[in-house]
Amino acid sequence: MMEALLVATGGFFGAITRFAISNWFKKRTKTSFPIATFLINITGAFLLGYIIGNGVTTGWQLLLGTGFMGAFTTFSTFKLESIQLFNRKNLSILFLYLSATYIIGILFAFLGMQLGGI
């Protein structure tokens, strides 16, 4: 039961944080590139790598890794925005978004793990 509470608590704060950051960017940027989702997912990849690399206890992994990072990052929004770019025939931005998210995401996860100690 405690494990579920840790995941739920982290998830609550992760979702609220993502919501706030997304809204902040929407009010300040006018671009076809989905910058908020990109930065959230890249930051999440780095932080999750750092959490895992740091070797924190299972409780912290559940709270921060599974809970917070699971709700903070957003695979579904990433895919939805990719489809929207495709439907709008904005293929150059789509290619940039897909390649940057995957390449930089993997690099940042690796960097986080290295800085965390793995």
Swiss-Prot record:
Alphabetical GO biological process terms: cellular detoxification of fluoride
GO cellular component terms, semicolon-separated: plasma membrane
Entry binding sites for Na(+): 70, 73
Localization per record: Cell membrane
Domain of life: Bacteria
Coiled-coil stretches: none
Keywords: Cell membrane, Ion channel, Ion transport, Membrane, Metal-binding, Sodium, Transmembrane, Transmembrane helix, Transport
Pfam families tied to this protein: CRCB
Control of this protein's activity: Na(+) is not transported, but it plays an essential structural role and its presence is essential for fluoride channel function.
UniProt name for this protein: Fluoride-specific ion channel FluC 2
Gene name as annotated: fluC2
